[in-house]
Amino acid sequence: MAVMPDKWIREKAESFGMIEPFVDHKSSKGVMSFGLSSYGYDARVDNKFKIFTNVNSAVVDPKDFSKNSFIDKETDVCIIPPNSFALASTVEYFHIPRDVLAICVGKSTYARCGIIVNVTPLEPGWKGHVTLEFSNTTPLPAKIYANEGACQFVFLSGESECEKSYDDIKGKYMNQHGITLPLVK
């Protein structure tokens, strides 16, 4: 597998709709950087967040997930409590080609503040807004800035198309819009 460069990412965004909306340059003045980089794409976080809370004494069970585990916030700056967690989604909608796997890595500025972003791989054929998981590993409240860069996607091109894509197997997170909570089917 090869890591794909800016020229390839731009071409796939423009001809295939791989990233929408697509920012064809790196924007970084006064904000967490976002847009096209040399070998990746820095995606923005939307302004809708779900922040873990224990107000309702909920238990986190991935097989029977309670919406009472979160409080919803729509804001330009999300404050994640100490040692807590929040969900959000990307501003960008992704459509991954059948011969590509996308891997997400965190932003160094957030990581240096104890904020970890986790996203599982974007499988070949997958489409949707990416649900982002933010962990505040510090004993202090931490800020996430909406509509600014949150993570970077790196695109790996396979030698050929896969036999069965995420779309072919009717993956449970296909075509997600906004924040999608855990699903066990």
Curated annotation (Swiss-Prot):
One of its GO terms (biological process) is dUTP biosynthetic process. GO terms for molecular function: dCTP deaminase activity; nucleotide binding. The keyword Cell wall biogenesis/degradation does not apply. InterPro entries: dCTP_deaminase, dUTPase-like_sf, dUTPase_trimeric. It holds the Pfam family DCD. The active site is at E133 (proton donor/acceptor). Its EC number is 3.5.4.13. It is an enzyme of class 3 (hydrolase). Pathway: Pyrimidine metabolism; dUMP biosynthesis; dUMP from dCTP (dUTP route): step 1/2. It catalyses: dCTP + H2O + H(+) = dUTP + NH4(+). DCTP binds at K107, S108, T109, Y110, A111, R112, T131, L132, E133, Q152, Y166, Q176. The keyword Methyltransferase does not apply. Keywords: Hydrolase, Nucleotide metabolism, Nucleotide-binding. Catalyzes the deamination of dCTP to dUTP. Belongs to the dCTP deaminase family. HAMAP family: dCTP_deaminase (MF_00146). Homotrimer. This is dCTP deaminase. It comes from Wolbachia sp. subsp. Brugia malayi (strain TRS).
